[in-house]
């Protein structure tokens, strides 16, 4: 029987090697590790190689891990067409164009959290009644345009504001003119039914947010720009970031247009009413501060009343997808594009911008607390601006180092625990456990693993097997489990002290397409064991105020409830 179980579980758990992706816990690691230094050097060489191949003359790159800038570099000259030009630096300004939408989305969530707008699903005309547009749809709710629809490109609006770009910010493209033109136009689709990228939508979103402030408490001439400057730029120390080109004209690196090897500098157009969709000028250094903020790494140092403080739930919304695109491997969020990286089995969240010789991309790998901002100051066809290739270099290295750091932590904890423990009884067992696939410190469990090992069945043919502990890799010291042929690993429940009969199991043999539907890379369930004492009495841990005194030697596992089924040992 044991031989049969061994062969069965050997086959079942072989697919742990080809399982749903799991991600190590981001912790501080030595940035001078040779593997990291090589990775950063490889990224440096990658950028230089790509620049040469694509004819890019100036470029900036910033990479953040957790709360630190770990790589930053400027390439080329401030102005390639000026033979006397100084080198480009991390503090020179450039246009980030549609990356501006990140700030507009941040503003939306903050005003919602502050109660300035009641709900993301409010009709924007409740706040901006001057906005009108025609609709072929008859039902009242089909004519609504909400904050959420604008932020996720599902509003049904056209892509562009009804003005020529060269007229932005002039007397030919004022708010009055724009609203008058829109009032004679129609929605191109029913809101929420179609993903259709819209610069107009984000400009309207920012202006509606400004109107909500004007209604409630602010009387500034331009409440959108004023609010973003004073509630995002200034608190984050983004002192060289602005909507006003005149403020930084002498510090701005011009964008270049490459026309078959002939380079020219397009004239700098204003944004005017369209600023919320693409009007920000920033620097590589300032964008590094934004990366740290959006990774949630500076919240602990901020007062909860700070204008730049972000609730964890708000950050989760900001980074959540809203609607799947037709290709099935990408989706729009508010505002990030979510793209699945098959190379690394994870989602990359990004927002790019492309305007007048500037092509920028901000990207996040949330499970690893990595953020990147790359900007080409020359027109280039790469919409991700080489960030995806850089991520392909970074992830294997960070994964290896973080996994090793986790194992080292366990070994150190085990050594410390062994040195400090003078006696060992049969009522406690030292186990190394994982919650959400990240290593945690040693835990002294009330229920030893040996008590759980065995075969559980019921009259419906369900079979639940628990074998012994693993001794390798990510699954170190966890129990191997099989339920109806599916491979699992058993972890401790977070409240194991109070509820020692509850355990967490993780499924590991799912296909990659299935894995894509699972947030954070793991598919977990909770299971509930029932124990009897030597007299056949069921132990009720919930009603035992002193379950520390339960004699493990006289306990027997009676049953387990897993995914709605009750199985008996």
Curated annotation (Swiss-Prot):
Location in the cell: Secreted
UniProt keyword Calcium, yes or no: no
Transmembrane feature ranges: none
Alphabetical list of InterPro entries matching this protein: Beta-lactam-related, Beta-lactam/transpept-like, Beta-lactamase-like_AB/R
Record Gene3D superfamilies: DD-peptidase/beta-lactamase superfamily
Pfam families: Beta-lactamase
Name the record gives this protein: Beta-lactamase-like protein 4
Protein species of origin: Dictyostelium discoideum (Social amoeba)
């Amino acid at each position: 029987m044991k031989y049969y179980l061994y062969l069965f579980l050997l086959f079942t758990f072989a697919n742990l090697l080809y399982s749903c992706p799991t991600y190590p816990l981001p912790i501080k690691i030595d940035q001078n590790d040779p593997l990291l230094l090589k990775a950063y050097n490889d990224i440096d060489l990658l950028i230089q190689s790509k620049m040469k191949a694509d004819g890019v003359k100036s470029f900036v790159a910033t990479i953040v891990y957790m709360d630190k800038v770990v790589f930053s570099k400027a390439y080329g000259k401030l102005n390639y067409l000026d033979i006397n030009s100084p080198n480009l630096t991390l503090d020179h300004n450039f246009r980030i164009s549609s990356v501006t939408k990140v700030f507009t989305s941040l503003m939306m969530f903050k005003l919602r959290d502050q109660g300035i707008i009641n709900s993301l699903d409010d009709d924007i005309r409740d706040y901006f009644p001057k906005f009108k547009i025609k609709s072929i749809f008859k039902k009242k709710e089909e004519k609504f345009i909400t904050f959420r629809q604008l932020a996720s490109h599902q509003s049904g609006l056209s892509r562009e504001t009804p003005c020529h770009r060269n007229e932005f910010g002039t007397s030919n493209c004022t708010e009055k003119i724009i609203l008058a033109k829109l009032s004679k136009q129609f929605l191109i689709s029913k809101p929420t039914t179609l993903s259709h990228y819209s610069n107009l939508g984000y400009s309207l979103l920012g202006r509606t947010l400004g109107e909500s402030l004007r209604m409630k408490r602010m009387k500034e001439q331009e409440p959108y720009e004023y609010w973003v400057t004073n509630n995002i730029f200034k608190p984050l120390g983004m002192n060289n970031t602005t909507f006003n080109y005149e403020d930084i004209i002498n510090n701005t690196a011009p964008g270049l247009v490459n026309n078959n090897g002939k380079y020219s500098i397009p004239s700098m157009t204003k944004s005017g009413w369209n600023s919320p969709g693409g009007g920000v000028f920033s620097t590589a250094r300032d964008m590094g501060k934004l990366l740290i903020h959006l990774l949630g790494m500076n919240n602990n140092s901020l007062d909860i009343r700070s204008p730049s403080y972000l609730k964890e739930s708000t950050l989760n919304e900001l980074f959540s997808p809203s609607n799947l695109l037709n290709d099935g491997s990408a989706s729009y969020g508010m505002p990030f594009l979510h793209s699945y990286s098959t190379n690394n089995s994870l989602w990359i969240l990004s927002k790019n911008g492309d305007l007048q010789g500037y092509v920028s991309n901000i990207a996040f790998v949330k499970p690893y607390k990595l953020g990147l901002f790359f900007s080409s100051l020359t027109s280039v066809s790469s919409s991700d601006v080489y960030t995806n290739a850089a991520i392909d270099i970074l992830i294997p290295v960070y994964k290896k180092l973080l996994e090793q750091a986790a194992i080292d932590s366990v070994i150190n904890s085990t050594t410390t625990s062994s040195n400090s423990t003078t006696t060992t009884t049969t009522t406690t067992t030292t186990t190394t456990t994982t919650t959400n696939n990240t290593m945690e410190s040693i835990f002294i469990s009330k229920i030893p693993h040996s008590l759980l090992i065995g075969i559980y069945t019921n009259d419906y043919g369900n079979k639940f097997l628990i074998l012994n502990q693993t001794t390798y890799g990510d699954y170190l010291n966890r129990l191997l489990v099989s339920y109806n042929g599916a491979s699992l690993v058993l972890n401790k429940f977070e409240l194991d002290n109070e509820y020692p009969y509850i355990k967490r199991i993780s499924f590991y043999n799912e296909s990659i397409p299935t894995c894509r539907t699972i947030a954070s890379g793991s598919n977990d369930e909770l299971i509930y064991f029932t124990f009897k004492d030597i007299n056949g009495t069921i132990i009720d841990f919930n009603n035992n105020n002193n379950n520390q005194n339960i004699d493990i030697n006289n306990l027997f596992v009676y049953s387990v409830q897993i995914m709605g089924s009750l199985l008996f040992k």
